[in-house]
């Protein structure tokens, strides 16, 4: 596996897919390409244009665990799946928190989850306040109440918009 960004670049700039292609072309063993694979189309390009035998997804999966299914479906059919609804995103976030609590206990799980929670809400209009408030909660119930309140307000806004 090789990432198309240097250590010095860290998370800045774009992954160098030309270098990945050069390496993939030179190898006789399977090559896994990584870096800026954020959409099903980019996964396809990594396989077809770069010549990777497989694709590794990193930060694009944070708060978006469906991305792998979306990519596989696109590679198999050429069709994109519908995006997840806000309700589906929040339900999955809650499921993740429940799993973390089962694994580590609430006292450790909630602070750990707070770092992930913002990714589930990223890109949703008017979610900034909720993303910020999540950093101030310490219990599962507080997280669930905050997320439920966000969904309720989001749905109310959507109903007003769609009138």
Which residues does each PLM region occupy?
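Flavin-dependent oxidoreductase catalytic cores
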Residues: 1-163
